[in-house]
């Protein structure tokens, strides 16, 4: 019996090293199932040098990982410190040898093994200048490991952020995938979107036509709990918020027919202990129940105020049993009933356009605004001199990872659908960019819905700024877990209005006379809607606009037909004209 067992083990080890052409490829859906729950070997090869951030890799780690019950290991790797800065951008052979040794340790234990490019921020800092070097690095990685089994998975780039744009990320994914496919035609490759692999950015991810792709996102929300040790976690609303995010990702995955890998998630060691265990348990369960694979982040660091995020002690070879159990077992620390499925909001008839303007805030009454900030950023607000009488003065000091903002607590839960624009007077101590943010209402009490923003470049003298609501874009650096995922700015459910940070700079802002702007009053009954220019707005205009939408060669007055003044003539204008004629 012992001989048979030894033979089986030997065969499995040999098969893990067989090249893909011999062993056979595995499609991405099956690969994600095979990956199951895994862990990261963090702070090892993603450090400037191995051992500078955490203990160097040891073969026994993989024995311990396997005994614990993990199915895959993600090995983050920083390549730039081991690559020539100039052409031909050769990767140090000794470093490649070391990486191959560790990959083989992992593969020989039967792990699906993920390697990536990690902390290579030089590419993000100047994409157009550095993409050539990045291509050469991946060409060497792909060539070196082309003979490994299908259990080796490539991940192109960890957490794109900073200067790199969505279009550049999509271009990079296509370029690197083409390079990989020259030597690894069927190997599974993981691609991700921007803003630190945010789930919010998945909608911006262009998916190449390739059957062996896996999409990734990372999850550390709520950040104030997982990284800043603030408060506790584990209420019904806390869990519902995470479930909404994973539902959102699952819908995106199904729509785009691509499986999903939650490549990182974790909580710093100084967070509330009971909450941390419960958070690991719930997030792991949500990932698996949605059909994702997931890899918990572990960096081997214990006791550090800034970097403690580990559950495996590399010296004692002991796991934090509570965290390990929470990650690998289902629902042992929490009770949760999924929220009742709610139907999406029914189709709405567009509101009848408003005319003129409505002043909503002149700062002449009691103070209704409040400041908020965190992570070394600060903000305060007070009533001060405005453009006309009183105004709001905002003093802020940003930080590289911090946030600040001021929120209007009076005008919450508003319906602004009939308005076209928002207007305000603004003056700044400098020309630093700030953002105007409108948060939608949410179906979860106490939570925001989707965030929509517009970047303001204020002057140092009083200026009136008018912003069409159609110019707002979905916030990409963060979205509340309770967002509805509609990708539509729903003005009929405005939750709150904010002025907030756009970068880490500091300064002072003065705000006055916030207004909602409708159609020009001189156009009432005159031009807007008079599609045939006969001086009347009637059923003839309605019929003519309908014909135009079916055949754009028909002659109409396009200025008058653009009912909502967004520059396009479409079904929204048709619906708004109908409401005008009905007098609603």
UniProtKB/Swiss-Prot annotation:
MF term (GO), any: beta-glucosidase activity
Gene3D superfamilies in UniProt: Dockerin domain, Galactose-binding lectin, Glycosidases
Keywords of the record: Carbohydrate metabolism, Cellulose degradation, Glycosidase, Hydrolase, Polysaccharide degradation, Signal
GO cellular component, one term: extracellular region
Limits of the CBM11 domain: 354-584
Entry superkingdom: Bacteria
Active site residues of this protein: 159 (proton donor), 264 (nucleophile)
Enzyme Commission number(s): 3.2.1.4
Pathways per UniProt: Glycan metabolism; cellulose degradation
GO BP term, pick one: cellulose catabolic process
Record's catalysed reaction(s): Endohydrolysis of (1->4)-beta-D-glucosidic linkages in cellulose, lichenin and cereal beta-D-glucans
Domain Dockerin, chain residue ranges per copy: 524-584
Enzyme class at the top of the EC tree: hydrolase
One protein family per Pfam: Cellulase
Signal peptide: 1-24
Renumbered residue ranges of the record's region Catalytic: 25-328
Cited PANTHER family: ENDOGLUCANASE, GLUCAN ENDO-1,6-BETA-GLUCOSIDASE B
Task of the protein: The biological conversion of cellulose to glucose generally requires three types of hydrolytic enzymes: (1) Endoglucanases which cut internal beta-1,4-glucosidic bonds; (2) Exocellobiohydrolases that cut the disaccharide cellobiose from the non-reducing end of the cellulose polymer chain; (3) Beta-1,4-glucosidases which hydrolyze the cellobiose and other short cello-oligosaccharides to glucose.
Family statement drawn from the similarity comment of this UniProt entry: Belongs to the glycosyl hydrolase 5 (cellulase A) family.
Name of this protein: Endoglucanase D
Gene source species: Ruminiclostridium cellulolyticum (strain ATCC 35319 / DSM 5812 / JCM 6584 / H10) (Clostridium cellulolyticum)
């Amino acid at each position: 019996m012992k001989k048979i067992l030894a033979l089986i083990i030997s065969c499995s080890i040999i098969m893990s090293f067989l090249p893909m052409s011999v062993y056979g490829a595995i499609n991405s859906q099956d690969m994600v199932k095979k990956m199951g729950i895994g862990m990261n070997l963090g702070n090892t090869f993603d450090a400037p040098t191995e051992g500078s951030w955490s203990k160097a890799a040891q073969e026994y780690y993989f024995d311990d990982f396997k005994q614990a019950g993990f199915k895959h290991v993600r090995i983050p790797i920083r390549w730039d410190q081991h690559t020539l800065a100039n052409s031909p951008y050769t990767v140090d052979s000794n470093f490649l040898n070391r990486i191959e040794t560790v990959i083989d340790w992992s593969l020989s234990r039967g792990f699906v093994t993920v390697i990536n490019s990690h902390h290579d921020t030089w590419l993000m800092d100047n994409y157009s200048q550095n993409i050539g070097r990045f291509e050469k690095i991946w060409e060497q990685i792909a060539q070196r490991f082309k003979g490994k089994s299908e259990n080796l998975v490539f991940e192109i780039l960890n957490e794109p952020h900073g200067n790199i744009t969505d279009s550049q990320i999509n271009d990079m994914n296509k370029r690197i995938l083409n390079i990989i496919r020259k030597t690894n035609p069927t190997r599974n490759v993981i691609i991700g979107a921007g803003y630190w692999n945010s789930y919010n950015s998945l909608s911006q991810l262009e998916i190449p036509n390739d059957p062996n792709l896996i999409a990734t996102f990372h999850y550390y929300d709520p950040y104030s709990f997982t990284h800043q040790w603030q408060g506790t976690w584990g209420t019904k609303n806390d869990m519902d918020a995470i479930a909404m995010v994973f539902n959102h990702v699952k819908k995106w995955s199904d729509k785009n027919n691509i499986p999903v890998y939650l490549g990182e998630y974790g909580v710093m060691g100084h967070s509330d202990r009971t909450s941390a265990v419960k958070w690991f348990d719930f997030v792991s369960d949500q990932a698996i129940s949605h059909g994702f694979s997931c890899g918990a982040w572990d960096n081997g660091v214990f006791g550090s105020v800034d970097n403690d995020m580990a559950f495996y002690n590399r010296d004692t070879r002991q796991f934090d049993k509570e965290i390990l159990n929470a990650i690998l077992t289902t629902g042992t620390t929490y009770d949760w009933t999924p929220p009742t499925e709610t139907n999406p909001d029914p189709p709405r008839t567009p509101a009848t356009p408003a005319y003129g303007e409505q002043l909503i805030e002149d700062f002449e009454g009691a103070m209704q605004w409040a400041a908020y900030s965190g992570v070394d950023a600060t903000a305060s607000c007070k009533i001060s001199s405005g453009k006309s009488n009183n105004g709001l003065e905002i003093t802020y000091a940003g930080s590289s990872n911090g946030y600040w903002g001021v929120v209007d607590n009076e005008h919450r839960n508003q319906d602004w659908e009939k308005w076209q624009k928002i207007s305000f007077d603004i003056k700044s101590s400098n020309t630093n960019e700030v953002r105007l943010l409108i948060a939608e209402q949410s179906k979860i009490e106490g939570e925001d819905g989707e965030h929509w923003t517009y970047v303001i470049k204020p002057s140092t003298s009083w200026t009136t700024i008018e912003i069409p609501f159609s110019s707002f874009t979905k916030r990409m650096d963060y979205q509340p877990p309770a967002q509805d995922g509609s990708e539509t700015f729903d003005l009929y459910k405005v939750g709150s209005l904010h002025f907030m940070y756009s970068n880490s700079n500091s300064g002072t802002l003065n705000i006055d006379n916030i207004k909602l702007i409708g159609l020009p009053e001189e156009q009432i009954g005159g031009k807007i809607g008079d599609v045939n220019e006969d001086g009347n707005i009637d059923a003839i205009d309605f019929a003519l606009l309908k014909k135009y939408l079916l055949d754009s060669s028909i002659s109409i007055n396009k200025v008058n037909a653009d009912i909502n003044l967004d520059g396009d003539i479409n079904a929204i204008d048709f619906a708004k004209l109908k409401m005008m004629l009905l007098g609603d």
